Amino acid sequence: MEPFKHPIAILGAGSWGTALALVLARKGQKVRLWSYESDHVDEMQAEGVNNRYLPNYPFPETLKAYCDLKASLEGVTDILIVVPSFAFHEVITRMKPLIDAKTRIAWGTKGLAKGSRLLHEVVATELGQVPMAVISGPSLATEVAANLPTAVSLASNNSQFSKDLIERLHGQRFRVYKNDDMIGVELCGSVKNILAIATGISDGLKLGSNARAALITRGLTEMGRLVSVFGGKQETLTGLAGLGDLVLTCTDNQSRNRRFGLALGEGVDKKEAQQSIGQAIEGLYNTDQVHALAQKHAIEMPLTFQVHRILHEDLDPQQAVQELLERSPKAE
């Protein structure tokens, strides 16, 4: 493929944003990787690698780090946002006066914005019905950077943008599958991090493999209830953005959310566990957002509710498990 005429801007230089930047730059595309932290950008520019969040993977010549948001967006049509969900709205607001009508917005952020809003709703409110896309699926940043085989889902509201973005990203080692269910993909990405905390807690308490499998399976049911209420497709649940990402995040210790849950299950204080991770723990923030959404729409999500009580009401993890085990039996 010939490199695209215009550079692509990636807003967010954490591990996942950097991994996606590497995928694009290795295909010869010009990539501008933006971070709001000037000292971090200085390091990346001097060292040619993101030693803070994704060390050992040198930047190709076409990948440049930026701190000036305006400069990073100049002459750019396609923007890929990869910041924590709690910062998503702020980034959209900051870039709003710097873009034009031709801009197309994609994101690799997984979660809900403040007020339990889906991210495409935030984009539509601030920017109108621009071409949008969300990328999600089982994709550990270190494995993507190491060029290990990975498959993700890309859902969009615009067929041309979907086609172009898949062409930008897709390769033998990074396979991108088209999807038209933005709602389902976004909600799956929000809930799976909460369930990863739950399975981490279970494993930290040494409850065994049977319990882990049960949590993943019943968690998928909770995910399905939420997706159904908001008009998402049930097929998304068994795809890469649903079951695929859920299994990976709940079982691999590279998952920050799982490691956070493990620490809580082992009796580590919440604040100490959070500090030990070193990067954003999406499930910690999104438990509150998903919990509020479930309460508002009367959706039964017992695992999510117990994780919320552990994180925000100081419920002891052992007690949370006991209460789940004491629930009345129901039809599967």
From Swiss-Prot:
Short name of any one Pfam family annotated for the protein: NAD_Gly3P_dh_C
Biological role? Catalyzes the reduction of the glycolytic intermediate dihydroxyacetone phosphate (DHAP) to sn-glycerol 3-phosphate (G3P), the key precursor for phospholipid synthesis.
Quick check: keyword NADP in the entry?
Answer: yes
GO biological process terms, semicolon-separated: carbohydrate metabolic process; glycerol-3-phosphate biosynthetic process; glycerol-3-phosphate catabolic process; glycerophospholipid biosynthetic process
Gene it is expressed from: gpsA
| Chain residues that bind NADPH | 15-16, 110, 141, 256, 282
Q: Give me the reactions it catalyses.
A: sn-glycerol 3-phosphate + NAD(+) = dihydroxyacetone phosphate + NADH + H(+); sn-glycerol 3-phosphate + NADP(+) = dihydroxyacetone phosphate + NADPH + H(+)
Name the principal localization, coarsely classed: cytoplasm
> In the UniProt record, does the keyword Cytoplasm occur?
yes
For this UniProt record, the keywords arranged alphabetically read as follows: Cytoplasm, Lipid biosynthesis, Lipid metabolism, NAD, NADP, Nucleotide-binding, Oxidoreductase, Phospholipid biosynthesis, Phospholipid metabolism
Q: Where in the cell is it found?
A: Cytoplasm
Enzyme class, first EC level, given as a word: oxidoreductase
**Organism field:** Coxiella burnetii (strain RSA 331 / Henzerling II)
- Signal peptide (from-to): none
Tell me the PROSITE patterns matching this sequence: NAD_G3PDH (PS00957)
Which residues of the sequence carry a binding annotation for sn-glycerol 3-phosphate?
Answer: 110, 137, 139, 192, 245, 255-257
The catalytic site is made up of 192
**PANTHER family attached to this UniProt entry:** GLYCEROL-3-PHOSPHATE DEHYDROGENASE, GLYCEROL-3-PHOSPHATE DEHYDROGENASE [NAD(+)] 2, CHLOROPLASTIC
**Protein EC:** 1.1.1.94
Protein family according to the UniProt entry: Belongs to the NAD-dependent glycerol-3-phosphate dehydrogenase family.
Which molecular function term from Gene Ontology is one that the record holds?
Answer: NAD binding
> Which GO cellular component terms, listed alphabetically, does the Swiss-Prot or TrEMBL entry include?
cytosol
- What protein am I looking at? Glycerol-3-phosphate dehydrogenase [NAD(P)+]
* Pathway it works in: Membrane lipid metabolism; glycerophospholipid metabolism
